[in-house]
Amino acid sequence: GIDIHPGARIGPGFFIDHGTGVVIGETAEIGERVRLYQAVTLGAKRFPTDDNGDPRKGLARHPIVEDDVVIYAGATLLGRITIGRGSTIGGNVWLTRSVPPGSQVTQANSLHELSNEALQVGT
């Protein structure tokens, strides 16, 4: 199945292809014409708590996916990161850092700590 929290904000033209296993968290923001494939997670890294250990509600903790992004099968994007407009996130990528517009992130380059040079447009 597909699990989309009702609080997620989703733009027009959003498309899920082969949606089994897709999870979209409560504070996720998805732009226009975004495509996701099976088993993609747009999740939180953690749920912050207050001084009493109670969960703090209303904090943005899920990814922002800008317009015209494609995220391939099995990718996991965690935390309040931004995936820049026109980027492509490859299959099985685990991502906890923002990427600028036009980025191409593959499993091979996500296995190493991504430097600013590795995240340049068109790489």
Regions found by a protein language model. Give the residues of each.
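Long, amphipathic alpha-helical stalk/connector segments used for oligomerization, subunit docking
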Residues: 106, 122-123
